[in-house]
């Protein structure tokens, strides 16, 4: 369909282990500064993994009154903050500046993979020690996943689609991709889209540790997340949120919005293989579907922001999937994992990493993949090891994969 509507990125918001604003996070990322350290949120001494990528220096009252914040789990705080940043960055009209028609053309789709796990743990503890009367009437709306989108919609008066996708570690990316399709198909003109997560809690850490998915490099947390390194031993939990404002191109141009990049393609593909173990076919299908949707050849891509979790199986699997999808061109790609600095934000990963991919395209630079000390011979692509690289990026690709064999890929084009 030659007349399909174009989708562009006009706003960015970020709360992450490397910074609680877009500017701070991007600066630290380019400098190769890790946001991973020993856990301070609770006593993790009894766990095999005692470190994570925690958000630092974040004050929720910069974004909402404390009374409101007390009725939300932390993942909603992060998602709201990133959404507010993105809406402000885009200069979107809201409140009294909207009429009924324009309000209906703006929607919200910010998801989370797990939701309010810390609040669920806390409420369970209070129930056991103090009884049923201590369960807060705000417990359910404070912990369910769609409430980021709900709160953003209420705050700004956006009356278009208001929903949240939940697809494990592909959540944020799927929200962005599906939001873009809503614009492309003419359902809306603007979507606030991304992902958020806050699962650095005893059950969150303990569950992944029990599955032996986490690094146990407790003596050196900052070097623990080492995608594609020979000695990688698991991923590192992270937390935060990343949100994009997506907008129909003519709509953005008409109101004089700045344009960071174009969202040119979105693809998905299932492994249909195993609950948690990776498989090359699903990621390959996802990448090829995104390229088809963007109507570009793989040879036009210069930069790929990978899922790159630092797990022994996952990194090798993604490398092989990239080779299958891109053929000989895979060796010419710059493949980067920002998880080396942020850890893995699970449902928030696609949000913050899409922000980073857009910025890489906008500024024509690849962030480094830090902690590649001895590159795994089985992972033999160019991973932009340890130093940022100025480079031409006309087309960038973003991958995320999740438990259940769910995969997603976005294609961004330079504006």
Task: Put a short name on every predicted segment.
Residues 1-9, 96-103, 294-300, 331, ...:
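Flexible, low-complexity linker/loop segments at domain and module junctions
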Residues 2, 9, 25, 30-167, ...:
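Conserved beta-ketoacyl condensing-enzyme motif
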Residues 6-10, 37, 219-294, 303:
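Condensing-enzyme catalytic core mediating Claisen C-C bond formation in acyl metabolism
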Residues 44-54, 116-119, 198-225, 268-285, ...:
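Active-site-adjacent elements of ketosynthase-type condensing enzymes
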Residues 79-93, 145-148, 153-156, 161-197, ...:
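Active-site-proximal alpha-helical scaffold in enzymes
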Residues 86-102, 252-259, 287-303, 325-329:
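Phosphate/pyrophosphate-binding loops at sites that engage ATP/ADP/AMP, CoA/4′-phosphopantetheine
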Residues 129-136, 177, 181, 185, ...:
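Glycine-/small-residue-rich "gating" segment that lines the acyl/pantetheine channel
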Residues 135-140, 160-167, 229-233, 333-344, ...:
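Short pre-catalytic strand/loop immediately N-terminal to key active-site residues, enriched for Gly-Thr
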